[in-house]
Structure formats: structure tokens, C-alpha cells
Design a protein with these regions (language model features):
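Anion-binding (especially nucleotide phosphate/pyrophosphate-binding) glycine-rich loop
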Residues: 1-143
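Phosphate/pyrophosphate- and phosphate-bearing ligand-binding catalytic cores of soluble enzymes
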Residues: 4-5, 11-17, 147-306, 322-336
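Short glycine-/small-residue-rich flexible loop motifs, especially phosphate/cofactor-binding loops
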Residues: 37, 94, 195, 271, ...
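A common structural junction motif
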Residues: 42-46, 316-323
Length: 336
């Protein structure tokens, strides 16, 4: 078990915010996680459970303990199920699936972060969400040290939400996630510009490797590398609005993109609305909006969490003024 004091979290958040925590603890097994929670009973520190930090905005120093998983492994349990340690890199899991003819995860290629976070955030892209794959989540209860095995339905997944993100927040240390894949390849090509990108390559029926590479190329073209430009990927969730609201806006904006959710709701891309407000490529101090994708906020160098908060709240205000729609961060802010 690794323990550090007055520890910089700069390397533990992709936004590149240099915030410190009072104490940093990394556990590398279920047994160490249980030992850790027993020691926490004797203390009264505020807690932050931290994964890869790819979906986190640190708004200041944290006077508490950061708990970080170092449990990193992958194993195939049976023909369709794969179990990963909570610290196993998400895209390495996707790569494993593709190379072992296990299908379903390929549309989630090169999403940053770790497998444990997939069970918290219900990450998603191109018509697929983690909830479509998650079979079981193993977690240690902080209050008791007991190991629990939660099935998919227990976690109450919805768009970028789960019980781990809400009522179970800071109550469990996720130690592993088991995913159920498919041995039958049924590619999903109709979300975003996947089919158009394949057509440019002269590919009509892509192999899973070709689909993964195409999605990787699409994402790399519009999303900045956090090793070069601090960011947390898509900053805002795409709002889901009533059909009547969509029709009202569609009458004003003929080319407004949208995705039908059901008979009564439509999803409108937040990035499109932000771009319509003139924010694409613009900055507010050392924080800005990426010039290739308006949904991504970036650290232009030396930005604090407060700088990013000021930017995203200004964008929220402008979108609400122009479209009458509230957009909410997908990224978690802490301390909040």
C-alpha cells in the first residue's frame, strides 16, 4: 500500500490542474482495500475516490484523503465474460476484446480512464454505453470492509449516471468489473460520422479491427491529447429535451442535429449549441474551448480549477439564453 502526504494530484488528472491533497493512499488488492477501510474508521478525513482522473475537474486543494486503486489485471472468465481490475486501462480492455474476437466494446475505443470509472460514470460513445457491457461490479464497502458483488441492474445505470455516482458515492471502493461481451459481431455504424468515415476508406462492411481504427481516427481528429493539452474529453452532457422543445428549435435552426431517444424525447448535441453561441476556439483567461470540438474545454496553460469553472458557467449561461436549454457538466467537479 502506497501512502503519501501533501501530495500533488497533477499527474492524476488529465486537465493538468496542480491541486494537492492532504493524504494519498493507493491500494493494490482487495485485501489492501479492506485493510484501508478498517484504518479509515479510526479517522475523520473527508474522502475522494479517484480513478484515472480523466473525468475530473479539481477546483482547489483537498483537505482530506484521496483513495486510488492500483488493482490492474485482466482475465477471461468464460467464453463471453472478461474481468478487469479497477485500475486496468479502459482502452487496453477494448483492445483485448478486439484481439480476442469479443464484440461490443469497439465503439468505446480510446476513451481515457480506467475500468473502475466505467462502472461509476457509465461512459459511452457512438451508440454504446458501459451499461450495455457490465455484468458485475465487485466493491469493498467503506463502512464495513465487506466485499459486495453488484449485478448490472443493482447499479441503476442511465445516461452518464449510476448509483456509484449518486447515492453510493464514497461508500464503496470498486476493485474489479466483469463485462459480458458477444461472440457475434454486430457492428453499430449509424451513430456520428462512422459510416461516412468508413465510406471515405472504401469500406462498406468493416472488420472489428477496421471499425476500432476508424473510431480511433475520428476521436483523435477532434479530441486533444491530454498529454499535450489538458482536458477531460467531453465536458458537457448532451441534453435530452421534450419533442415539443426540439420542434420549436428545429423551426428556427433547420440544420440542428439531433438524435431520437423515444417518441417523446430528442437529444441535442451540446457541442453544436456551444458552437452556435460563438465559443468554439475562444478562451476566457487560461481556459478555453477546443477549436476542433466545442464540447471540449481545455487548459491553455496554468489554468486553475476556478478558471475552468468560470468558463463553463459562462457557457452554460449563454446556451440557456440562446436556446432555453440547460446543459450540465459530464465531468465531476471536486471539491464542489
Amino acid at each position: 500500500m502506497k501512502i503519501e502526504h501533501n501530495y500533488s494530484l497533477l499527474k492524476h488528472n488529465t486537465f493538468g490542474i496542480d491541486a494537492k491533497c492532504q493524504r494519498f493512499v493507493e491500494y493494490e488488492s482487495v485485501e489492501e482495500a479492506q485493510e484501508l477501510v478498517r484504518s479509515l474508521k479510526e479517522e475523520d478525513y473527508p474522502l475522494l475516490i479517484l480513478g484515472g482522473g480523466s473525468n475530473l475537474l479539481l477546483t482547489g486543494d483537498f483537505k482530506g484523503t484521496v483513495l486510488h486503486s492500483g488493482i490492474s489485471f485482466i482475465e477471461q472468465i468464460d467464453e463471453e465474460r472478461v474481468r478487469c481490475g479497477s485500475a486496468y486501462v479502459w482502452d487496453d480492455f477494448v483492445d483485448y476484446c478486439v484481439s480476442h474476437d469479443l464484440y461490443g466494446a469497439e465503439n468505446l475505443s480510446i476513451i481515457p480512464g480506467e475500468c473502475g470509472a466505467s462502472a461509476v460514470q457509465n461512459i459511452g460513445a457512438y451508440g454504446v454505453e458501459a451499461k450495455d457491457l457490465i455484468d458485475e461490479v465487485e466493491a469493498v464497502e467503506i463502512a464495513t470492509g465487506e466485499v459486495h458483488h453488484f449485478k448490472n441492474a443493482d447499479c441503476e445505470y442511465s445516461y452518464r449516471q449510476s448509483k456509484f455516482k449518486n447515492e453510493w458515492r464514497n461508500k464503496y471502493l470498486i476493485t474489479s468489473v466483469t463485462y459480458r461481451l458477444s461472440k457475434t459481431y454486430q457492428p453499430k455504424l449509424d451513430y456520428g460520422n462512422i459510416r461516412a468515415a468508413l465510406a471515405e476508406q472504401g469500406i462498406e462492411n468493416p472488420t472489428v479491427a477496421e471499425l476500432r481504427q476508424t473510431i480511433t481516427d475520428i476521436r483523435n481528429a477532434k479530441l486533444p491529447d491530454p498529454k499535450k493539452i489538458g482536458n477531460a474529453g467531453s465536458f458537457f452532457m448532451n441534453p435530452i429535451v421534450p419533442k415539443a422543445k426540439y420542434e420549436e428549435l428545429a423551426a428556427q435552426y433547420e440544420r440542428m442535429p439531433h438524435y431520437t431517444i423515444d417518441a417523446d424525447h430528442e437529444k441535442i448535441p451540446a457541442g453544436w449549441m456551444i458552437e452556435q453561441c460563438g465559443w468554439k476556439g475562444k478562451a476566457l483567461g487560461p481556459a478555453g474551448v477546443y477549436d476542433k470540438q466545442a464540447l471540449v474545454l481545455v487548459n491553455l496553460g496554468g489554468a486553475t480549477g476556478a478558471d475552468v469553472v468560470r468558463l463553463y458557467q459562462t457557457i452554460q449561461h449563454d446556451v440557456k439564453e440562446k436556446f432555453g436549454i440547460e446543459i450540465h457538466p459530464e465531468v465531476n467537479t471536486f471539491p464542489n
